[in-house]
């Protein structure tokens, strides 16, 4: 490929599912590469496998790409001169090219049934041979083909893979990669219904759309020699290929959609209240790293820095802890009003806050969220973080460590004195609560952990949490007094 050729890259999803982490990373790296080089980022929908297409799959993919912060220069919703941008609308482009290969003797009709092909594969496996098509129909005469069709057989079209060739390409990530043509076998380029297969349609589309670089996952690397053979058959120049290493879980296994230990779909992160900028940041570091130790960057900084030479040759580890840390860095920078907006739907969904808030309730939610602003990693996390504010006194239970603290002889005296102090307060505000705790210290002679821990455990139900006077203010007089009453009655 010429060095001066305009950079044009594509993300080409199939609408057979929703946008997951792996595909989002592919889209993101192509987006960054295009923007870094002032090139074009194209969205092409590869929807030829109609049986597997999911309703709203295409719309959902594009909605979530936009939510992550990506825009594109051409696509189904951004017309350009290289359209149509859905493969299902490009059949009239593929058909004459398939016919051209047939006419030139570079492809042939195959009448083998699925049963015959399966039997062939099983026989090869039994002989410890690599399963590949034997070429059974490669030399059928026109008369034999006509006889098959007269019998009602519909042909698929297979590409004639040349024998004894080494197919080599320089990969942006893996450097020089080679495949032997003898290990490939004649592959199908058009199915029996005339619809082109993935490898044929992709090669044709990438050429006609003038795609300069194909940056995709490592799981596509075995497709590359087939696509290069198609390029060569037409006398076209292949794009530059780059195959990113796969994303693995903590067990170093490839991410699987069935792996429940990791949330994999962007829509789910969106629903949980993750921030798009944070997810963009996290995904951009999955298998790519800048110079230095810094890990938090803006989209503009990523665009400026992105260099495919810094793509890792080792699998990218999906680290849940790192993801929550990254999102927390972004949440901490948000104004409190934005964090409340992020949190409120989750509190309402949990049924702990009413759907139709009045101003007093909204003010209370602001106070509640402010206690966890620095700690929160995503919107939905406010629910488990703040559950102590909604528990009934009778439902509060204590673990063994908390029970040990509450078993000290001075605890009933401390709790009784603190209850008396709060009952005397006209306004339950943090400053007044703090002063009340000091008076309890003076009255009882108990100080330090012996004073604070019992008060915290009885009033909040937890040994650790937000600053105690603030937590008690947000809990409110009625709830705090009720919890102390309940504990004193039971002890």
UniProtKB/Swiss-Prot annotation:
SUPFAM superfamilies referenced in this protein's UniProt entry, alphabetically: An anticodon-binding domain of class I aminoacyl-tRNA synthetases, Nucleotidylyl transferase
Annotated GO MF terms: ATP binding; glutamate-tRNA ligase activity; tRNA binding; zinc ion binding
Placement of sequence motif 'KMSKS' region: 254-258
Entry's Gene Ontology cellular component terms: cytosol
Residues that span the membrane, as ranges: none
Chain location of the short sequence motif 'HIGH' region per the record: 13-23
Note describing how the cofactor binds: Binds 1 zinc ion per subunit.
UniProt function note: Catalyzes the attachment of glutamate to tRNA(Glu) in a two-step reaction: glutamate is first activated by ATP to form Glu-AMP and then transferred to the acceptor end of tRNA(Glu).
Family under the similarity heading: Belongs to the class-I aminoacyl-tRNA synthetase family. Glutamate--tRNA ligase type 1 subfamily.
Keywords, in A-Z order: Aminoacyl-tRNA synthetase, ATP-binding, Cytoplasm, Ligase, Metal-binding, Nucleotide-binding, Protein biosynthesis, Zinc
Cysteine pairings via disulfide bonds: none
Main subcellular localisation: cytoplasm
Enzyme type, top EC level: ligase
Protein name: Glutamate--tRNA ligase
EC numbers for this chain: 6.1.1.17
InterPro entries on file: aa-tRNA-synth_I_cd-bd, aa-tRNA-synth_I_codon-bd_sub2, aa-tRNA-synth_I_CS, aa_tRNA-synth_I_cd-bd_sf, Glu-tRNA-ligase_bac/mito, Glu/Gln-tRNA-synth, Glu/Gln-tRNA-synth_Ib_cat-dom, GluQ/Sye
Subcellular localization: Cytoplasm
Requisite cofactors: Zn(2+)
